[in-house]
């Protein structure tokens, strides 16, 4: 449904060339939800704005439903954009118009008959759960309600694609979850392909089928959510996955943690990351028996993404130095990521 082919975007900033996107290619099948994740300034917003040509690529092609938008005339592009809805971090509602009037605006601009507008807007407000707010002005809505109005307005032209530019970034966690649930419902019931950009891996984990990781204008990793979460290949992807966990050590351990062992009886605090089959295997107990080491678990958590289970454990590991080294090697050979956080006495 969406295919980006060798997209590059160069900006001229104070006489200098800035490569915002560098030879980016991305293919999103019809009906999928794809998340593009990256840090601030990575090129996420530029990428999504290239899909509907709000930003015209310096080079490359943008296909939506088989149509190369970069080859269209201005009039043809305007017509094709009706198939592409878009919502933003900031809701961009007209403060002088009611909820009903904001949703009806694109239909009014198309000179649709009032009866059809009423039918369409009523159905959309029901879909986003705002039937009782139709006569309310934006100033009297919560952030989540404003985003629901924006979603309804974006759906007014029956788009095939919905672009979401940091659509939940300004919302609290509970409201974020409700908006993500709504987007998932829209995807399932209407069959709309969704491309969203975010800096939060939790968003990807909750609703996406695919994920692409962008860094400094380049897509450095992409695949299904289950593939990326079970076997992240880049350090940045690993960092984003790690951010979904509440992985804080107890204060009493943080206070005495050192980078190197201070005494011969110091022992390491180690973080173990499990994905795929390694999550269900009793690897720590096997390792304990095999190498005569003990694991005192301090923090542990398991989660799911794309049907794949993954998790981590932070433990203090006791045993002689050689046994601990062999235990670490054994676990790494069993597809467990091992990271020594420090040492305690």
From Swiss-Prot:
Catalytic activity: L-methionine(out) + ATP + H2O = L-methionine(in) + ADP + phosphate + H(+); D-methionine(out) + ATP + H2O = D-methionine(in) + ADP + phosphate + H(+)
Subcellular location, principal: membrane
Enzyme class: translocase
Cellular compartment(s): Cell inner membrane
The protein's Enzyme Commission number: 7.4.2.11
Pfam families in the cross-refs: ABC_tran, NIL
InterPro entries per record: AAA+_ATPase, ABC_MetN_proteobac, ABC_transporter-like_ATP-bd, ABC_transporter-like_CS, ACT-like_dom_sf, MetN_ABC, MetN_ABC_transporter-like, NIL_domain
Disulfide cysteine pairs (residue numbers): none
Domain of life of the source: Bacteria
GO CC terms of this entry: Gram-negative-bacterium-type cell wall; plasma membrane
Residue ranges occupied by any ABC transporter domain in the UniProt entry: 2-241
Residues that bind ATP: 38-45
Keyword field: Amino-acid transport, ATP-binding, Cell inner membrane, Cell membrane, Membrane, Nucleotide-binding, Translocase, Transport
GO molecular-function terms, A-Z: ABC-type D-methionine transporter activity; ATP binding; ATP hydrolysis activity
Topological relation to the membrane, as annotated: Peripheral membrane protein
Coiled coil: none
CDD domains attached to this UniProt entry: ABC_MetN_methionine_transporter
Family membership: Belongs to the ABC transporter superfamily. Methionine importer (TC 3.A.1.24) family.
PANTHER family for the chain: AMINO ACID IMPORT ATP-BINDING PROTEIN (PTHR43166), METHIONINE IMPORT ATP-BINDING PROTEIN METN (PTHR43166:SF30)
Subunit structure: The complex is composed of two ATP-binding proteins (MetN), two transmembrane proteins (MetI) and a solute-binding protein (MetQ).
Function in brief: Part of the ABC transporter complex MetNIQ involved in methionine import. Responsible for energy coupling to the transport system.
Name used for this protein in its record: Methionine import ATP-binding protein MetN
Species this protein is from: Mannheimia succiniciproducens (strain KCTC 0769BP / MBEL55E)
């Amino acid at each position: 449904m969406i295919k980006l082919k060798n997209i590059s975007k160069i900006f001229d900033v104070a006489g200098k060339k800035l490569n915002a996107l560098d030879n980016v290619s991305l293919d999103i099948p019809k009906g999928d939800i794809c998340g593009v994740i990256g840090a601030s300034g990575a090129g996420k917003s530029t990428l999504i704005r290239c899909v509907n040509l709000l930003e015209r690529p310096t080079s490359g092609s943008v296909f939506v439903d088989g149509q190369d938008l970069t080859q269209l005339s201005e009039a043809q592009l305007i017509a094709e954009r009706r198939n592409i809805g878009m919502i933003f971090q900031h809701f961009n509602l007209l403060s002088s118009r009611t909820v009903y009037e904001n949703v009806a605006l694109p239909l009014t601009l198309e000179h649709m008959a009032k009866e059809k507008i009423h039918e369409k807007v009523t159905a959309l407000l029901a879909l986003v759960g705002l039937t009782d707010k139709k006569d309310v002005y934006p100033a009297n809505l919560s952030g989540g309600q404003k985003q629901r109005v924006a979603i309804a307005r974006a759906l007014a032209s029956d788009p095939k694609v919905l672009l979401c530019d940091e659509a939940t970034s300004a919302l609290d966690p509970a409201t974020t979850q409700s908006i993500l649930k709504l987007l998932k419902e829209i995807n399932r019931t209407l069959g709309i392909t969704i491309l969203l950009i975010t800096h939060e891996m939790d968003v990807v984990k909750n609703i996406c089928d695919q994920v692409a990781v962008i860094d400094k204008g380049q897509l450095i990793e992409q695949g299904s959510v289950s593939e990326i979460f079970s076997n992240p290949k880049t350090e940045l992807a690993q960092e984003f996955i790690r951010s979904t966990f509440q992985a804080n050590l107890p204060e009493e351990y943080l206070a005495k943690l050192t980078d190197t062992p201070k005494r011969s009886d110091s022992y390491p605090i180690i973080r173990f990351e499990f994905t795929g089959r390694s999550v269900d295997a009793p690897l720590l107990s096997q390792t304990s028996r095999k190498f005569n080491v003990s694991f005192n678990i301090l923090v542990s958590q398991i989660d799911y993404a794309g049907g794949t289970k993954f998790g981590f454990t932070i433990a203090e590991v006791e045993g002689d130095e050689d046994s601990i080294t062999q235990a670490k090697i054994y676990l790494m050979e069993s597809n467990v990521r091992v990271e020594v956080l420090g040492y305690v006495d």
